[in-house]
Amino acid sequence: MQNKIKQLKNYAVYDDIEGFLINKDIRSSSGNSNYMMPSSTRRVSNTRKNYEGDIKQFFSVIKGKDVKSLVPDDLVVSKSELSNYVKYLQEKGLVNNSINRKMTSLKMLYTYLEHDYKDYIDLSVFNTVERLKTVTKNWDKTTQTEAERIAQDMYINERQKPLMKKLFVKFAIRTSFRVSAILRVRWKDIQLDESTGHYIVTVIDKGSQVVSTGINQVFYEELLQLKEEDDSETELVFQGLSEQSLRHSLKRSKKRLGIPPERELVLHSFKGVGIDYVYENSGHDLLAAKEQGNHKNTLTTERYMSRKINIANSAGVTMDEKIDLNPLYEATQEDFISFFENADLVTLKKFIKHVNER
């Protein structure tokens, strides 16, 4: 009887792999129930799907087994097996970036399993296979004007959930959240900010981080149209939408609007619109743009931005620049009104504050 219990414990490799996948699928690292999705509305994350696919493929190719049949001895892997696996993936036509991702998935699995399988796992073997060189290919950028055109096109021409698709695009460009995070936003995640009269949206974004941003009361009232359209008291704001359906909708919209198919305009392109907007309307404050994008560093933020190099405001130019103030004294009231009607928000707010404090 004791031997049988020991055998069940020692040979539960599949259960331990499932534990790893569940760990990757957890919505919140903090375990805060305010931000956890109920099981009835949770989707299996793309992250988990990717890890699961990588793991199944590896053991099928290298060990010739399904993950449900694995025993501890199958966890032993040599550097030649890893090298041969990389070669196998290359011959299958996978790009280097995808191969690197798969190898990272495996190393993370083995790191998770090491504690319970010390006699079978040697993590150093993963260091014998070098990461393959990759060329970073960014998606194409878009603008607020173009994104709004796409949103309106979806509203007019899409047969299924046209209003929801339109508001999804508008939500994406305003919040700069990732698609997966937006699809998990619940009505209770949008709370009134009494100090401004606008609304705070809180989501679980990349890395299980709780992040927040604001939306205007005007746009929130637009979102409420979804409640009026659906009487089912749904918890999710964008109930029924999926990344796949949105990708297909965007593809159709690009075709209708004459956007070249070779242009890499994807759902993730919408994230950069809000980042660009904040940068331009904050007096080119890169840190404010970084906060809008919820990035750890400004280098990541700059990848999303469509700004061009402008040396006119560089220190090397402006330190020695003398500004002629005579046009300021010669300007008419109409000149000032015209200027401030087209000024960025930071400049306009500074001027209004100056006038009010006089």
From Swiss-Prot:
Boundaries of every Tyr recombinase domain copy: 137-319
Domain called Core-binding (CB): residue spans: 23-114
Consequence of gene loss (knockout): Little effect on the percentage of cells with partition defects and no change in sporulation frequency. However, yopP disruption strongly increases the extent of the partitioning defects seen in codV mutant strains (by about two-fold) and, to a lesser extent, those seen in ripX and dif mutant strains.
InterPro entries found in the cross-reference section: CB, DNA_brk_join_enz, Integrase-like_cat_sf, Integrase_catalytic, Integrase_recombinase_N, Integrase_SAM-like_N, Tyrosine_recombinase_XerCD
Active site, UniProt feature: R178, K206, H268, H295, Y304
UniProt KW Signal keyword: no
Leader sequence segment: none
GO function term, MF aspect, one: DNA binding
Protein name: SPbeta prophage-derived probable integrase/recombinase YopP
Organism of origin: Bacillus subtilis (strain 168)
Gene assigned in the entry: yopP
